[in-house]
């Protein structure tokens, strides 16, 4: 299962983070490595905004999490946040409970969850639920859980690639 291309630069100086962005290309997102919930995130669309974005992301990361380590990630165009709930038992059985769309957000926090996702076609649903089951199997997971994906919805295509975000060890 793919993840969004990104890295935690070994050189965490402003220059080192800038070089990571240069390698990845724009548009990009700078994120607080210790963070979540949208804190310490900065969208970088043009070269002129890189330095200011690095400094702002680092300040917010330190203030919110006490850690200024930054992560750089490629921006996924037109994203949808789609989650698949799974259940796995002690006998190796893993099943999915289909998907829900959590794309309606405010400040990177979910506001509305919709199931089934209006953006997911039957073919994409089959690929995503198969991937969610594969994630649980690869981790030898036993319990109920939620596998989160970011789906890239390109203009003119509803079969865009999707990327693994995280797995929560509970139903959400």
Regions found by a protein language model. Name each.
Residues 1-147, 151-172:
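N-terminal beta-alpha lobe that positions the nucleotide/phosphoryl donor
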